[in-house]
Amino acid sequence: MMVVKKTVRSPGSATVINAIATGRGSAFGIGLRVEAEAELIDSGVECISREGADTSLMELCTRMVIEHYGVDAGVRVVTSSDLPVASGLSSSSAASNATVMAVSSLLSDEFGLQPMEDFEMLNMAVDASLQAGVSVTGAYDDASASFYGGLTVTDNMERRIILREPMENQKVLIYMPDRKSLTAQSDVPRMKLLAPWVDMAFREVLDGRVHSALTLNGILYCASLGFDPGIALDALEAGALAAGLSGTGPSFVALTHEDSEADIIDAWENLEGDVLVTSVDNEGTRVLE
């Protein structure tokens, strides 16, 4: 008997507006991804991360999908990723989205069942992130940008997408310091102090000024979380269109056209850590044929 597998690729995302201060946020898909491969096994749930990451979120997602379809099935999910964990690049949202879609596609095909709608898969992935304690707000902004690709602007409390559109194709440069930052361990009361100013950044993105929104948000959260805003300013000085902290850090993201790419890398190369170069992802989470 042929073993049926379903493989799904899901992009990470970078922050335009961090939703923790106000409950409203914005993010866009990036070209670093999680890939999840799902297949049926005799019984139980097996989850394996090729990078050795914690699999509890994957296991929760898998069990939630099995429960949704009401089938007696064993499922194995194996993930691989070039998306760093605990870095502010939505690794948890991408892993949730990839796992939910892979297992859903597998079970609906194998058992001849009605596939889940996109919004159902997205909501299930967000529920799993909240239940697993890897997110403060459920990260609906990050999760929706990862799921649909492009730019999303969201009300995380209401789980509502206010705006969704393709993102202009730009280079995305990411500075990753030699430290991790788990969102659920962040100082939430301190971030909520920023609400009036984060609201100003939020209005910028609604008015189409994504670059200024990203930069303002990124510098505000640097102040709240104790990161050095000079890292973003160095990128801006080198020609970046926008630069700021992504998520709750520790990664910084800069958007640029190709002509400034080398200058920004030069500006960051003396910092401890790595600089990654990728691009905007407008495809989102999808089953690979």
UniProtKB/Swiss-Prot annotation:
Q: Which GO terms describe its cellular component?
A: cytoplasm
Which E.C. number(s) belong to this protein? 2.7.1.71
Q: List the disulfide bonds.
A: none
Annotated GO molecular function terms are: ATP binding; shikimate kinase activity
Amino acids binding ATP: 84-94
Q: Where in the cell is it found?
A: Cytoplasm
Query: Which Gene Ontology BP terms does the record give?
Result: amino acid biosynthetic process; aromatic amino acid family biosynthetic process; chorismate biosynthetic process
Ordered alphabetically, the record's keywords are: Amino-acid biosynthesis, Aromatic amino acid biosynthesis, ATP-binding, Cytoplasm, Kinase, Nucleotide-binding, Transferase
Q: Which Pfam families did the record assign?
A: GHMP_kinases_C, GHMP_kinases_N
Looking at its record, which EC class is this enzyme?
transferase
What Gene3D superfamilies is this protein classified in? 3.30.230.10, GHMP kinase, C-terminal domain
Pathway, per record? Metabolic intermediate biosynthesis; chorismate biosynthesis; chorismate from D-erythrose 4-phosphate and phosphoenolpyruvate: step 5/7
Protein's organism: Methanothermobacter thermautotrophicus (strain ATCC 29096 / DSM 1053 / JCM 10044 / NBRC 100330 / Delta H)
The record's similarity note reads: Belongs to the GHMP kinase family. Archaeal shikimate kinase subfamily.
> What catalytic activity does the UniProt entry give for this protein?
shikimate + ATP = 3-phosphoshikimate + ADP + H(+)
Q: Which SUPFAM superfamilies match?
A: GHMP Kinase, C-terminal domain, Ribosomal protein S5 domain 2-like
Major location (coarse)? cytoplasm
The entry's protein name is Shikimate kinase
